[in-house]
Amino acid sequence: MKYYIIAGEPSGDLHGSNLMRGLRKADPEAEFRFWGGDMMAEVGGRENLVKHYREMSFFGFVQVAMNIRTILGQMGDCCRDIKAFAPDVVILIDYPGFNVKIAKFAHGEGIPVHYYIAPKVWAWKEHRVKALKKYVDKLYIIFPFEKEYFPTKGIEPHFEGNPIMDAIAQRCAAAPEESVFRAENGLDERPIVALLAGSRVSEIKANLRFMAELAERMPERQFVVAGVGWIAREQYEIFTKDMPVKFVCDKTYELLQISEAAVVTSGTATLETALIGIPELVVYGIPWLYEKGKPYLLKIPFVSLVNLNLKREAVREMVVYKPSVDEAELELRSILIGGSKREKMLADFDELRSIIGGAGASDRFAADIVQTIQNSKFKIQN
């Protein structure tokens, strides 16, 4: 069968590539056409990559407004390409600002729409639920608490676990020995605190300087920034200049594996850190106006996916206008080896793994997609 897949971010590229491997297992004759990145291209062939996510990375109102003509042009290109390819199914991976509109188009063309990794409408832009209900034939969720949320909105989702477990299993299994990793990346023998300041320039700007200030307080530890390749290193160095921090790029899982603890922004990274088993402090600097309006704007009790899945504050969240370095230092020291909160947090992470489920979710989701489309075709033929 023919699969048209759209991912607009690095995480979507990762999960899309694993899903494509699963689709090929379930359907050896699978044909792919996709929007994504290098990892998806490795599986589906670079000749079938329509657009790289680097050309689609517009975040926030200002960036979107400045690039609206480009975005609308890309949507038009995508719709025309879908029509020309005539897929058996369109698979959308998160990225709702773009993908919800593509869902409407594909639905109008009579093409089945499967949304893999549902948009986080439970956190913001809940109005998108109406479009999901109207235009999406099957919604795939990756967080257990979503099993309770979506039925209240009239949508029966499908859950097979979380593909993050597949990504972690693959990367950690292939990671080099700790001594080799330290030598290759210029890291000394001091215990490591990983700094995950975000995957967007705006997040780096909001969080990294504060994180680096912690390094000045704790010279007995080695603070290492987990950078991402699509952000120029200079963007990090603006906020770490003359600060005692080190830098590695595109090696977040490998770095976390050998870290004593981590300071992490909100988002998927909080969950990844916990599933790898590294105690963490969640810090996110927000605008003053947003802090004042947070009680009215935020629809969820926590911002960390760890806490949302456990339904309690297992990791400390400091989501404020100006986080206190003194307070953050105390919290960080409490989760280091010998700290008062470390063992309880590690036990909570064990519980989290049991809730999320083990590896293999990508294959299970893929098998369900193939079976669903095949069943649909059989009904039409008969």
Predicted regions: what they are:
Residues 1-382:
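Nucleotide-activated sugar donor-binding and catalytic core shared by glycosyltransferases
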